[in-house]
C-alpha cells in the first residue's frame, strides 16, 4: 500500500496555525510528530488526513493539512502570483461532533501555477491541501488563511457560499482575496473598482469557467 509506505511518501501531514491573528498574521506549519508533542489537538492525538470522500458517518472529519511541496523561495521570499488557493466551503455551521455523512466537508487547495523559475516548470501542481470540517466556518477559513500566508497565495473561494470573504476581511487579509478571474476583462472595461471576490458557480459557461 503506497499510501502507508514511508519509503515512497513525499508529502508531510500536519497542521497550520496563524499566530497573532488579525495583526502580524504569522503562519506556521506544524508536522504531525510536533503536533503530538505540543498536544495541539489535546489528549496526545492527531487527526489523520481525510482520504474517504464522501466520508462515512463514523469517520473523523477534523482532518489535517497535507503538504506535498514546501513554498518555493527566491531570496528568502515566496514570489507573488506563483501560487493560488481555491476553497470549497459549506453553507451552515455545525459542531464537529454532530457532523454525519449527510454533511459536506470543507476543502482548500494550494496550486502552483505553470512557471519557469521552479524545479517543476511548465506544469500546474497541487502543493498543499486540507479536507475536513471544524466546529465553525471561521475555524476552517483560518486554516486557509495560514495556507495563503505561507505560500503568498491569493484565495479564490466559491462566492455566495460560506464566510471566507468576510472572515479574510475581518482578520485584515483582504489582500489575499482573489477577484473573480472570469470577469477580469469585463471589470477592466466597465467597472475597475468592482470587488467581486471568488467565483460564482452558476450555470452554462459561468459554471464551466468556475469549475475550470
What are the functions of these language-model segments?
Residues 1-188:
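RNase H-like, metal-dependent nuclease domains and their acidic two-metal-ion catalytic environment used
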Residues 171-212:
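Metal-dependent DNA phosphodiester-chemistry modules and their immediately adjacent helices/loops
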